[in-house]
Amino acid sequence: MFFMSNKKELLWQSRFSEPFDRDALRFSSSVHVDKALFREDIEGSTAHVTMLAEEGIISEEESGQIIRGLREIGAELEAGDLVPHWEDEDIHTVIENRLKEKIGATAGKIHSGRSRNDQVATDTRLYLRRQIRTLGTALQGLQKTLVSKAETYRETIIFGYTHLQRAQPISAGHYYLAYFNMFRRDRDRLTDLLKRVNISPLGAAAFAGSTLPLNPARSAELLDFDGVFSNSIDAVSDRDTVIEFISVCSMVMMHLSRFAEDLILWSSYEFGYLEISDAFATGSSLMPQKKNADIAELVRGKTGRVYGSLITMLTIMKGLPLSYNRDMQEDKPPLFDTAETTIESVSIFGKLLEHTTLKEERLAKLTADDLSLATEIAEYLVKKQLPFRDAHRVTGRIVSHSLMSGTTLPGITLDVYRTFSELFESDIYAALKPEASIKAKKTHGSCSFDSVAIQLEEAKKLL
C-alpha cells in the first residue's frame, strides 16, 4: 500500500520562495473529494498523451511509458493500494507524483499543452456523462415498474384527488402512468443535457490555448466526445452543465417526493389504500404497533439535499469573473452528492414500489357511493342540454342535500332528484357507478380503461 504525501514540491510551487502554509494547504486541499474522479482523470490523461505522441510533441516510447504507468496507478487506486493524502492537494497531483515515482522525469511530459483547468473540466464532463447514463438507466427501471403496476391495476378504481380532497374515481393504472410520463420527461431532459455535456474542453489549456500543435479534435475522438469546444475561455470557466445536471436531478427528486407523499398517506391507517411490504417498512423503538414508511420519507427528505446543492452551485458561480477561479473547486461536493443521492433514490424507490399492494377490497367499498361521483351528475344534465353552469349549480344543491340528509348520491330517490331538475330520469343511477363513470370517459389520454390500455401500449413501446 502506498500513502502519497507532498514530500515533493507542489505542481505549481516553483515560482514561490516560501513553502505553502500547511494550514492553507489543508484548507485548499480537495483530494478527499475529487479522488472520486481518478478513473476520469486517468482516461483523460491517456487520451491527451496519445494525442501528444500522434502529433509528435512527445515520442511513442514516452507515450507508452506514461500510459502503462497510468494503468498501473488506476489499478492501485481501484484496489485501495494507493491512498491519497490531503497534502497532495488534489487527485491530479496524486496521479502525477505517483507516475513520477514509477517512470521518472518522463512523467512531467504528461502535462504538455494542458492545464489543470481543462484537465478538471474534462474529468467533470466525463463524470457527468457517466452519471447521466446511469441515472437514465435507473429511471428506465422505475418506469418499467410503473408499467407493471399500471397493468396489474388497470381496472382497479381509486380516488383521484385535487387539493387533497376526493375529486373523481379513476383507474389506478391511470395514476401510475401519470408518474411514468413525468419520469419520461426527466429522461428526455437528461438526453438533451448530454448533447451539451458531451463536448470536450481538452486543449483549451489554462484558458487561452497553447502554442504547442495540439489536436483537440483527436483528444475528443479518443474520449468519445461528440465535439470540441468553440472558445477556450468558455471551455474552462463555466459549470453550467453541472448546474443543469443538478437542476434535472432536482426535478427527478421532486417527482419522487410527490410520489413518496402519496405512498406515505395511502399507507396510513386514515387512508388505508395501500400496503407496504414489511421488507420496506420500519417500526418504533417504543410503540410496538407502528409500521412506518421510512424509505418513502427518506426519499422525500433527501429531495431537500438535492435542492440545496442546486442553490449551492448557483451561488458559487453567480459572481465569478472570467475565466477560471478557485471557487469552482467547490462544485465537486454538490455534484457528487447529487448524483449519488438521486441515483440511489430512484433505484430504491423502484424496489419500494414493487413491494406495495393496493387494498382493492377497501377501495371498492370506499369508491362505491362517494360524493366524487357528483361530476357525473353535472355531465348527465349537460347531455340533457342544460348549460354547464346551470348543471353545476343544480349538482351543488344535490350534494348539499346529500350531506345534510346523510344519503349517498345513489341512495337519493328519483322523486327527490326531480325536485332539483325535471331532466332527471331513471337512467341517472347508471351514471352513479364508479366503473360506469370511468368507462364513460371519451377524451384522449383519459382515465377510461380503454384509454389506459392504449397508454400502456405506448409506454411499453417507449421502453
Curated annotation (Swiss-Prot):
UniProtKB keywords: Amino-acid biosynthesis, Arginine biosynthesis, Cytoplasm, Lyase
Gene (name only): argH
Protein name stated in the entry: Argininosuccinate lyase
Lineage start: Bacteria, Pseudomonadati, Chlorobiota, Chlorobiia, Chlorobiales
Pfam families: ASL_C2, Lyase_1
Main enzyme class: lyase
Subcellular location(s) of the protein: Cytoplasm
Family per similarity comment: Belongs to the lyase 1 family. Argininosuccinate lyase subfamily.
Predominant cellular place of this UniProt entry's protein: cytoplasm
